[in-house]
Amino acid sequence: MNEALKSLTVTGKERYKSGVLEYKRMGYWEPDYEPKDTDVIALFRVTPQNGVDPIEASAAVAGESSTATWTVVWTDRLTAAEKYRAKCYRVDPVPNTPGSYFAYIAYDLDLFEPGSIANLSASIIGNVFGFKPLKALRLEDMRFPVAYVKTFQGPATGIVVERERLDKFGRPLLGATVKPKLGLSGRNYGRVVYEALKGGLDFTKDDENTNSQPFMHWRDRFLYCMEAVNKAQAATGEVKGTYLNVTAATMEDMYERAEFAKELGSVIIMIDLVIGYTAIQSMAKWARRNDMILHLHRAGHGTYTRQKSHGVSFRVIAKWMRLAGVDHIHAGTVVGKLEGDPNTTRGYYDICREDHNPMALEYGLFFEQHWASLNKLMPVASGGIHAGQMHQLLNYLGEDVVLQFGGGTIGHPLGIQAGATANRVALEAMILARNEGRDYVHEGPEILAKAAATCTPLKQALDVWKNVTFNYDSTDTPDFVPTAAVTA
């Protein structure tokens, strides 16, 4: 600890005579601290109120997310306070964003309950996000020590075992969300599933708010969907599936629906992010016990991940969900209708699919992360994608991904089955070109046009959606330009 810091930090009896101290004088600011391999590290984007010292604001974040309260308390002397205080050890200005700072904060591993996302999030994104001296606060990234990672089960099935169960290798998986997502009867819903699977898709899925409504009870949907899956498997000779959304009001209801899906022979169930971290982990444990693939729809994430100055980055949510144990997560498309900067999305996909993430600031990854043999998490791309973008999707997202063409299947002018066939032919043509060593990225339109010459459904798809793009600036791009630290 340097001399300047010693003069700031009040210790001993003087500390308990002081009443209210600045957080940086209470030990939450330690610029000489070297994080331990066993520390949990969080990176916050801190925007202090006008006139608030950025170091004091960052120290306050460390304090309020660990052991501090607004005044000095005598009971600190009954604990290993030096050990349990979170330590802000670095504060850097955010490039090209005056008034905002990156605060690096280390937390002792003993501050967290093993294997609990609920406990982790209660500390890291709890009361501190309502702290008055802060104009805005965003959790940008986290690093978890291997000792902590090993307390979680990780994805229940994982990419390798999922591909083995489906007997599908060497290409992205194809899916579609049933549209319209609300209003169909169970019988008509099942018809959509059958036609899409028979046409060449691997999966269909419920949407986030397809639960159990007056027009379609969940049990009816499950029965008609699994009848469709079984008929499509018999017709094509391929393993098929449909994501049956078991999201409900209570855990008891969700377990009941999941058990019924299992009884019907489903290989996969689905939940929504909005059910909460404890429910997600509970369903992940159920899925592992029952050999079921678990799909997570990230419904609701945009309320706190999209704004660059306040909230939680989706890269953090992706890390939490890999720990929690889901097998699929929607992670962006780059070219679709939903938020997704190419570099930022690449970072999300690397979090899901790699055994080890090196620090890669250009992708928004501020820390090296070892995943300690946890299974890999299959990212899902959905929202405004179509067959004409197949070369771009393969280039940006790789082959370990589920490409979900909802409107791009069900909106086909020749019908649902034709829409599915168009997507399957486009994918197979692009994979063949890649395997032959062709420059499929630049030759993509030519490859698709050649395939369409002998496939009317693909030709129709290319004609209908050839001019459909979603070229909007992303609101969440990486900030990685090196700058001088204010801690120097």
From Swiss-Prot:
Coiled coil: none annotated. The modification N6-carboxylysine is found at K205. Mg(2+) binds at K205, D207, E208. Its EC number is 4.1.1.39. The lineage of its organism: Bacteria, Pseudomonadati, Pseudomonadota, Alphaproteobacteria, Hyphomicrobiales. Pfam families: RuBisCO_large, RuBisCO_large_N. The record marks K337 as: Transition state stabilizer. Binds 1 Mg(2+) ion per subunit. This is Ribulose bisphosphate carboxylase large chain 1. Belongs to the RuBisCO large chain family. Type I subfamily. It comes from Bradyrhizobium sp. (strain BTAi1 / ATCC BAA-1182). PANTHER family: RIBULOSE BISPHOSPHATE CARBOXYLASE, RIBULOSE BISPHOSPHATE CARBOXYLASE LARGE CHAIN. It comes from the Bacteria. The keyword Disulfide bond does not apply. PROSITE patterns: RUBISCO_LARGE. InterPro entries: RuBisCO, RuBisCo_large_chain_AS, RuBisCO_lsu_C, RuBisCO_lsu_C_sf, RuBisCO_lsu_fd_N, RuBisCO_lsu_N_sf, RuBisCO_lsuI. The active site is at K179 (proton acceptor), H297 (proton acceptor). Signal peptide: none annotated. GO terms for biological process: reductive pentose-phosphate cycle. It catalyses: 2 (2R)-3-phosphoglycerate + 2 H(+) = D-ribulose 1,5-bisphosphate + CO2 + H2O; D-ribulose 1,5-bisphosphate + O2 = 2-phosphoglycolate + (2R)-3-phosphoglycerate + 2 H(+).
